[in-house]
Amino acid sequence: NLSSEKADRASIFTGLSYVFLIAGTATGVIAICQWLTLDAYIPGMVDMQRAVRPYANFAQPNNMATFLLMSLLACLYLYEKKKVQTKWLIPAVFMMLMSLALSQSRTSWVACICIIVYLAYQQFKGYISIKWYYVTAWTVLFVGFIFLLPTIGSFLTQFADTQIKSVDIARRATGDMSRLAIWQQMLHAIADRPWFGYGWNQTSVAYTLVSDHFQGPVWVRSAHNFILDFILWNGLLIGLPFLAYFGYWGYQLNKHVNSVESVIGILMIGAVLIHSMLEFPQYYAYFLLPVGFIVGLVQSQQSNIKTITLSPNYMRAAYAVSLVLLILIVRDYSVMVPKLN
């Protein structure tokens, strides 16, 4: 019901983009404060303690980076639709790009390349109107942040009464290739049980069993690749047909792109999808729920699909249940945090 008409889809996507803009800006501010070691003095921010790369309140730099990419795409949508004045978008995008560079997330680097290529393609088709030199300027700024911020951090450490941590960009780009070893080990695990797999969410079991004859670099509970995880869980007989269907579904979504909403939606989905090929963002509700919502918005643009109209009472009931679940989550979290500390 929310996206059955074009005007409704635009309105809903605009509201979603406002949420990403606000959350992304707040995330950027928190990450910069963490980098400057101010997080210990400001309430509501996670204290980095021994961590080196800022992660805002996500507790994982790569997750923060992917969320910032989605927020930047939301800013692009608001710019395209002229919903927010450019003078307000520029400082927000500046902080997000700075925080994205501070995360030193190689996953985000790969995603950025894919986003720029797809944007250029859709700009050629006429769905995106932003000038190429604007995209180039922001890209150059982002690359400049990647190389300059570690140096700026070292300078501030020497001449100010603070201890700013950073990782050399060359070492970050070429170090820690453990994912390749993990993938190799998981391929051996698939070869041991190729047809029916190990069961849902049993990657750690697969790791334990395969370690008897093929050692891996670290203990894992995920293959750091959605395709490998899905085949490990279900085996080739069930996994391959489902993966083929997912691929066909994605092809159909991209084939029917016909508006700015669908272009930005595809890019947001793609950012999380690329991340899922290198880690496991699908394990987190703050990615899974928005992606599912965006997929629904993009899917609704196909005019030849069958739709079901539900009574507003279903939505009211869903909101009520969601509110109860949110209260329970907050309660459990408030009980668990003191125990973890």
Which residues does each PLM region occupy?
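Membrane-interface catalytic loops of GT-C/OST-like multi-pass glycosylation enzymes that act
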Residues: F58-N62, Q104-A111, V220-N225, M277-V291
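TM-adjacent membrane-interface loops and short helices in multi-pass inner/ER membrane proteins
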Residues: Q60, S178-V220, I227, N234-I238
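Transmembrane alpha-helices of multi-pass inner-membrane enzymes
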Residues: L73-A74, A111-L119, V260-Y314
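A juxtamembrane structural motif centered on a specific transmembrane helix
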Residues: I294-N341
